[in-house]
From Swiss-Prot:
This is Importin-8. The keyword Protein transport applies. It is linked to VISS syndrome: An autosomal recessive disease characterized by early-onset thoracic aortic aneurysm, aneurysm and tortuosity of other arteries, motor developmental delay, connective tissue findings such as joint hypermobility, skin laxity and hernias, and craniofacial dysmorphic features. Immune dysregulation has been reported in some patients. One of its GO terms (cellular component) is nucleoplasm. The keyword Membrane does not apply. Belongs to the importin beta family. Residues 896-908, 923-934 have a biased composition (Acidic residues). Residues 886-934 are annotated as: Disordered. It comes from Homo sapiens (Human).
Amino acid sequence: MDLNRIIQALKGTIDPKLRIAAENELNQSYKIINFAPSLLRIIVSDHVEFPVRQAAAIYLKNMVTQYWPDREPPPGEAIFPFNIHENDRQQIRDNIVEGIIRSPDLVRVQLTMCLRAIIKHDFPGHWPGVVDKIDYYLQSQSSASWLGSLLCLYQLVKTYEYKKAEEREPLIIAMQIFLPRIQQQIVQLLPDSSYYSVLLQKQILKIFYALVQYALPLQLVNNQTMTTWMEIFRTIIDRTVPPETLHIDEDDRPELVWWKCKKWALHIVARLFERYGSPGNVTKEYFEFSEFFLKTYAVGIQQVLLKILDQYRQKEYVAPRVLQQAFNYLNQGVVHSITWKQMKPHIQNISEDVIFSVMCYKDEDEELWQEDPYEYIRMKFDIFEDYASPTTAAQTLLYTAAKKRKEVLPKMMAFCYQILTDPNFDPRKKDGALHVIGSLAEILLKKSLFKDQMELFLQNHVFPLLLSNLGYLRARSCWVLHAFSSLKFHNELNLRNAVELAKKSLIEDKEMPVKVEAALALQSLISNQIQAKEYMKPHVRPIMQELLHIVRETENDDVTNVIQKMICEYSQEVASIAVDMTQHLAEIFGKVLQSDEYEEVEDKTVMAMGILHTIDTILTVVEDHKEITQQLENICLRIIDLVLQKHVIEFYEEILSLAYSLTCHSISPQMWQLLGILYEVFQQDCFEYFTDMMPLLHNYVTIDTDTLLSNAKHLEILFTMCRKVLCGDAGEDAECHAAKLLEVIILQCKGRGIDQCIPLFVQLVLERLTRGVKTSELRTMCLQVAIAALYYNPDLLLHTLERIQLPHNPGPITVQFINQWMNDTDCFLGHHDRKMCIIGLSILLELQNRPPAVDAVVGQIVPSILFLFLGLKQVCATRQLVNREDRSKAEKADMEENEEISSDEEETNVTAQAMQSNNGRGEDEEEEDDDWDEEVLEETALEGFSTPLDLDNSVDEYQFFTQALITVQSRDAAWYQLLMAPLSEDQRTALQEVYTLAEHRRTVAEAKKKIEQQGGFTFENKGVLSAFNFGTVPSNN
């Protein structure tokens, strides 16, 4: 390869004027052998300009991630897709570790991503030598090679970070070499607090964290080595950050390597305590370790963390993530007596001076509110910000302490009450007090000591602050209303005030963060309080208009959810404004989708998705208003068109759901045109979305069968889609859906003249059965299509089976089909599939012109049917049982709980006692019961796609089968004897039960029909109702 030519092309990609020509040059060269190793040589060369090296690194990363592994050709194609040649791969393996060690940071980032992809595909099979190579550089006398080799080791460990313990053996073998090595290295580095030394220490900590985050490899750490590691973590957490760092701007300090190193050490100890060191909260393989951890390390580490919190209390700087992880660790310690004893004397100071301080409104909050209120909203509602926030961690610690340790809540409430009742207190502290009380709302509403005081608290301390001249206090007050929205109000006026103030804040407040909090509070009050819902009925239109305005301005997903919930609460009122609302939402969606930053901002995708869900909710609400639905259809079709035109595949699922909602009752000509458009999209890039298309396709078949059959193109489209799925590599779930659609078409069109389709459908599914099928669900679904064809027209199916010639199967396939069906009768699950199988077998046994294949399995037919009936009986019984259990659980849901642990007791002791008192039934048994329910219920996604056989007045499988047997008995006694001969006594008893039930069902159906013909049920007044009178006073007679 000509290196200079590649260098010039890479240089051209940086220049906008030359970019297209340069990219074309590279695209013509990348498949040439030695191209990828040439890129690596350019990357590591000090003689090449840095921007070119960086461009080469990005290009190589893209090549490796896309073209490294060997790939098979698509089904039906002989040409193998391109991948990097093995000679080139070996050259890269031989040199990439050195490349990472020698490269500057910005290039090194790209190369480590290459290495991760290579390790993922090649280790250990194709590249066991990577371990020796990393180890060689780790042991080097030159410290310059340590960081690069540690980064390589990190990629190795990260590759296995989320794998199950049994899949990590190659990593465990490697870490038997590396773990002692990096422990020794970090011990040597600890006394040196220079930038480079601490950078190396941080990287070692990151390796350890990735190793233990999801599984602790006990075979790598014994008590002695773990003690050394814990001492390392304790030392790093406890050591002083160089004082010169205080000269750096506070916003930049968390990124300093000394604070990051502390953060990772804390991250590790918090994770070890939470996942492996808390007895009573670990899986059985960690029982022994958890006891050892709690007794040996927990208190010592906590001592250091209490010191950190004291530093924060003394106004010394502590990085936010360090503070957050300290709170997380202490949160685990609250429930264990050994750590609680140490924490208990300090908990009041921690609560009042540290947690409270963190939960107050701060200078940085005020700065963001004033400079960019929309960014303030985004930050406050960002779940990822929450995850890393010291405020959230402080809130969680306080909540746990208040819930588990009885002395905490009264003292904290007294502290907050003092602040709220003193008019001279700093308003920011009032915000903190409200924040604390709102965070504890769930506990306060269950404690008899406090719950009756909460209404007075809202009246005296929250309602007035909703009118404060400080925006942040108004927002916090709305947040508190939200937190206490389930409160049982004794004074109706207070409830009315709460709702009116929330509405006023939503509609009239000028500050957007207040409006957002008010929206959430108002919706929560309406959902939890029946009277609140009534109060707001006259104001639905202005409320909805304001919510739409907020969404348009802020693009906040939480407010989109509020709109959805409000639509459900006020379905009748929303109907009158549905068109305007949908138009507004469509405009917001279009604006979001076409904004310049849409591609880069994930929040916008979530919010746009929320808008589509909201429009779908509106469609559901107005489904009975045909004239409104017709107007909404045009708006929705514009949205669907926009998404399809821009190929925004992440919204395909949502627009298909919209189309489904628009076709649930009738299908307009425009929606039939959409079928053709979707077919074109399906051909291009919607192949994997077939399962999402299925509900819509089902509607096309079942809602407007006349139009479906009026144009042969419609059925052709549906068949072609099913064929593409069943002949491609969409996966067996999609294939099951395709087979189901074919079955639905056959059953829906029985007697409607689709005879010409039956051979095509049957051949397609039986051909699929000749290729490898992994799941019984796909096997039975393919069989079910043929069974549906048997129900449609028995002679047509048998004729089709005789004519079909399958590859590698000489002669007709009737015998194979019948045998496969008989072998798989126990695989038909759920109600519909069993019913279909019973009807099919009943037709089979009643055939007059029976193929020899049926005679050959005569002894299996009736036993198989009886087995299927037994399965149906279990499904019905289990459904009734589950319904009863659901009602029972609902009744228990409102019981008050007391989870406090008496002063210094261990939570695990309390848990053990509770389990013993629960009739000896532990969690494992309960989980097994849940599994059993799922297994017997056998509900699948396919059960939801109804057919005419699933209607209440459809063919009854019990009557169908017994009638078939009676017919055979009277017509062909010899065949009847052959069918009955193999039955055991138990099976004959079961058969009699089926006969009895069939007769009962026939009698019930006839009685029901007779009543319907007479105009419905009439109830005679027998005096029963008059016996129940809840309004009268009993007499003394």
